[in-house]
Amino acid sequence: AHLIYIRYLSGNIMKRLLFILVFIYTTASFSQNALYKSDAFTIMPDKVLQGKFMAEAKSAKEINSNFISSYTKPSATKISFKFSIDGRDNENVTGTDHLYILTPVNGKDTTPVYVFGKPDPVNYSSYPSHFLNENTELLLKLDMRNILSEIKEKGYYKCFDGSRITKKNFKGVYIAGGIPPLSWDFEKLPSLKNSKMEDSDGDGIYEIKLHFNTTYTPSEEFKTLWKLKNNISSYPSYSSPQRLVDALYNMSIEEMIADIREDGAFMAGIKWPGVWTRDVSYSIILSLAIVNPDASKASLMAKVKNGKIIEDTGTGGSWPVSSDRMVWALAAWEIYNVTGDKDWLKKCYCIIKKSSEDDMLTVQDKETGLFKGESSFLDWREQTYPDWMDPKDIHSSKNLGTNAVHYKTYLILAEMAKLLNEPSETYTAAAERIKEGINKYLWMEDKGYYSQFLYGRNFFTVSPKSEALGEALSVIYGVSDKEKSDRVISNTPVTKFGIPCVYPQRPGVPPYHNDAVWPFVEAYWAWAAAQTGNVKSAEKSIASIYRAAALFLTNKENFVSTTGDYLGTEINSDRQLWSVGGNLACVYRVFFGMSFNNDKISFNPLVPEAYAGIR
């Protein structure tokens, strides 16, 4: 039995949603049974168990974890680093790093003298890198005489970014880098014991001794505790018989707050301080339009230039090789459906319409009706594309997820046009042609799911790979009919720790999009599974998200699909925005089954039996 009570604290259902939901799911089973159990891990109402590791929710405001990664990586002889004054990234523009090749003799090595803000004394970029064959003590030297002289003569040193270092605020010189004992976390450099350089004889040449081992664990700062610090009472609250779920919900709300920048927009994560079109859009669609429509609006408007949507970087630079920017339209529509803001509707309609006109001229393939361009969010060519494919090949390919986004975009344009008394038929026809093209050219009958993309040069063929995000979007947005939707959820390959971005994997390619699970993709998969009524699939996806967030004590960007470890992927970040949105979506999109339309809110809850109780 489902019983839902709703109280809106604002007069209009489509204004900012501040509500209390009470959801009762009655069943014979109750709370001390496992929520999910597999050979790899178990989710209990208050804890996660994985081998010798356990994460336990002591309350809805505290989680303890003893997870320590066993992942180690061989150290390379080529190291990259930057110098820092006062623990800020103020030596050079992002991406301009120093290089050195470790060449130890009896375990010791000394660098030539580097100069702050200047090119390397030796151009090491073309030197081959090997694995370090002995633990090494490196004496690294930095010439700061020009900077110190400038501060003495002018009273300040002007950094590349325009900031000034004065004698009064000059606190110290630090080194940042990617291999332990170095760290790229500039803000923490002053507190790290292996980062401050010293000028012991006062000659202006700073030195530091660094110890590099033959193998290393990429991050040695393993968390053991999350405890709620911020007041989150102004956001929708959630409570249930599952203490772990309550704590993860609260942790996600807190991380969402931490991801709000000074300008009111969302950053993509701790390591990604910028506003990214696809990151904020997918996050907004999942749950952030519901939780924080104001920051969602600010984020989307930060990605508009000259009245058009900005495409994120990707293969070939950006648009039109990457062409998934229209996910912005889906997020904008979600905000309108949640808030009912007519001014927002009018503004976004003009932006989406203008952007779509460029896409139809430049990106749409007239023969198939599909839109060309890179896989949505899979924007690192080597990770998911064959070696022979260069940017022009990727531009000419037709991807599942990107086309699902375009399909929904034109449905949205048609709906917006109707609400604004504008012609809508062209948009409806465009959407239908995309849907027809996806089902005609990308459906793999023998596998029971869609192909990642059509690719080729003179002749195009179907890639045998699945693509988790595209499969999920096709189900959620109705590209697939009921029969195909059921088959997609039942047949798309899933690993023991979750659904990988693509399947099969590229051998020899390090995990990132390849051989990796991304919690936000997992959340879309859970949403799609719930929409088809596939309880087992939804249960597994929710468990995948909760396992990682609890053990790692943050909503990580990704983790390795074969090990379940967040170490081992090429890049990873804490409190990744779309992972935060995905965690919250387990509550909003699955347990409550919430969906918003321009005139109503609907509930179609899917609550696995193990999650029974009042929430």
Descriptions of predicted regions:
Residues Y235-D246, S287-L300, I335-K353, E367, ...:
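Structural helix-adjacent loops and short alpha-helical linkers that scaffold large soluble proteins
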Residues G274-V280, I284-S375, D379, N399-Y407, ...:
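Aromatic-rich carbohydrate-recognition surfaces in CAZymes
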Residues Y216-P273, N337, K342-W344, Y349, ...:
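Acidic/polar, glycine-enriched structural segments that form the non-catalytic walls/loops
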Residues A1-A34:
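Bacterial Sec-dependent N-terminal signal peptides
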Residues T495, Y524, A528-R615:
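Non-catalytic C-terminal accessory modules of carbohydrate-active enzymes
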Residues L400-L442, D446:
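Active-site neighborhood of glycoside hydrolase catalytic domains
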Residues L21, Y235-G274, A295-W319, Q364-K398, ...:
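Extended glycan-interaction surfaces of carbohydrate-active proteins
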Residues Q32-K78, I85-P104, Y156-T214:
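Aromatic-rich carbohydrate-binding modules that target alpha-glucans
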